[in-house]
Amino acid sequence: MRRHNFSYSKCSLFLLAINLLFACKKEENTTNFDNNKVNLVIADNFNLSVFNAALRVSNMDKELQKGEGPYTLLAPSDNAFGKAGYPTVVSMLSERAAIVSNIANYHILDGKYELNKLPFLFNQELKTRRGKVYATHWVKGADTVLTLNGARILTQNLPASNGLIQVLDRVMTPYVHDKIVDAINADASISIFARAIKRTGILSEKTNQGAYTVFAPNNAAMTLLGFQSVQDVELANLDDLKKLVRYHILHDRRFVYDYILSTGNTNMSKQTMLDGNSVDIKLVPNTSSPGSFSGITLRGLGNTNDVLLQKQDILTGDGVLHIVDQGLRLTQ
């Protein structure tokens, strides 16, 4: 009888030991789970819900959770995604996976980038998982401003256990074309100006050295300049055509926000173009945020009305393309 009781006691102790072992392992697993990884910080922020959806669709959330990093996430706000055509989480979840993957990976840097520690310079090149981005660190009045591809950083250096998060006011688009001339040729709305570029050879392989910014007149604007079709471009005087084209190009990479940062208290500045002549740049006040600016207008030496940007900040491997609603005129 005593041996029977002893057997029961041994059995009970064994089961107790097993339960304690599993309890310890469960507690250990719970303790080791890191809920402060960059993807989980994103998931906990209600203002970054669409970007969180992009990470999930692209499976980048799993990689960021497993990875030691460090990573820097360039997270557009929900408002930024709304402006880019993704107003809700559902709209992102219903997008094609390949497009979402491009968006997500273009907003991820391998490494820890405290952008506020960059030199005070314009358009410093950084490499994301889907291509280059250009960071500007500058002082405007009393504010120190950070931008990426012309998108302003709203909140910087949000900490996570395996990296940092920078919150942007705009979704950045991965560039498709290495050459700005290819981006011009690909847009049907500027096909007449594209033919002028081709005929003059100004952005050809031989002449295209360094970065360029192009303010390309749309087809309606080219019509007002006397070019109703590509045939008119072919028949035009070549020297006159070169003057026209050069007055729409500058030798530098310039996003719209670069002008906002570099323009002084008068809210007006001048931009020297490829032909040596200048274009007036005027800042457009942001009516919903007094003291800030929403964009720019241009005016050539011969323009009597402001030239407006229809599309802006189209990044290529060697420059930036903007599309304008009027041609820049040298004379009236």
Positions of PLM-derived features:
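Mature, structured domains of secreted/extracytosolic soluble proteins
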Residues: 2-6, 11, 24-332
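Processing junctions and N-termini across compartments
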Residues: 17-18
